[in-house]
Amino acid sequence: MALALAALAAVEPACGTGYQQLQNEEEPGEREQTAGDAPPPYSSISAESAAYFDYKDESGFPKPPSYNVATTLPSYDEAERTKAEATIPLVPGRDEDFVGRDDFDDADQLRIGNDGIFMLTFFMAFLFNWIGFFLSFCLTTSAAGRYGAISGFGLSLIKWILIVRFSTYFPGYFDGQYWLWWVFLVLGFLLFLRGFINYAKVRKMPETFSNLPRTRVLFIY
């Protein structure tokens, strides 16, 4: 047994000299490629990310609200109050939106008319009686023309009532019915005054509405 161990010890140094440990040597090209594939350091990545986020903040991107603001809901009373305020009409400030009118424009002047149209329709209704009244009232669209036709027709009615009452060509036409004569006479007089008075009021409208907001006027004949 001792001889076997001595022989093994003598053989082992001789075998060890035949082997050499190879070092891990790499070629220069592979070493450069490995250095190029290495990831960048963490500090450079953090600096680039901070610069990117600073750029986004400077460009005007909206920041999200905080958690408290995003999760805070209004109470029931506040919600009802906001709803009630939204439904209230802004009536007190409405008059400030209107602009006063310096004068009537051409369209308003055509609706009112002038004295010439009033006199023309007045004489048409007075001379041609009901035919002149219908023609002048239907062919004119201005207030002066229609009020002139009404006034002229009223005076024409008075004229014919007086002719029939005191003429010898119509004897006994109103015998026993004098109340009917008074009814037509008063009716003609009221129509005559109505046309003149209403036209006088219409003529003053440009002065009345010159300092008021734009108003739509409805004429009732």
Swiss-Prot record:
Kindly indicate whether the keyword RNA-binding belongs to this entry. Answer: no
Alphabetically list the UniProt keywords. Acetylation, Cell projection, Endosome, Golgi apparatus, Membrane, Repeat, Secreted, Synapse, Synaptosome, Transmembrane, Transmembrane helix, Ubl conjugation
At which residues is N-acetylalanine found? 2
Q: What is the name of this protein? A: NEDD4 family-interacting protein 1
Which portions of the sequence form the region Interaction with ITCH? 42-76
Q: Which gene encodes it?
A: Ndfip1
One matching Pfam family is NEDD4_Bsd2
Extract the GO molecular function terms from the UniProt entry: WW domain binding
For this protein, the parts annotated as crossing the membrane are 117-137, 144-164, 173-193
List the residue ranges of the region (Interaction with UBE2L3).
Answer: 2-41
What does the annotation say about its assembly with partners? Forms heterodimers with NDFIP2. Interacts with several E3 ubiquitin-protein ligases, including ITCH, NEDD4, NEDD4L and WWP2. The interaction with NEDD4, NEDD4L and ITCH leads to relocalization of these proteins to exosomes and eventually to exosomal secretion. Interacts with SR1402. Interacts with SLC11A2/DMT1. Interacts with PTEN. May interact with phosphorylated EGFR. Interacts with BRAT1. Interacts with KCNH2. Interacts with MAVS. Part of a complex containing ITCH, NDFIP1 and MAP3K7. Interacts (via N-terminus) with UBE2L3; the interaction mediates recruitment of UBE2L3 to ITCH.
Membrane topology field: Multi-pass membrane protein
Main subcellular localization, coarse class? Answer: membrane
Where does motif PPxY motif 2 map?
Answer: 64-67
Question: Cross-referenced InterPro entries, in alphabetical order?
Answer: NEDD4/Bsd2
Q: Which residues lie on this side of the membrane: Extracellular?
A: 138-143, 194-221
Answer whether the UniProt record assigns the keyword Acetylation to this protein: yes
Q: Where in the cell is it found?
A: Endosome membrane; Golgi apparatus membrane; Synapse, Synaptosome; Cell projection, Dendrite
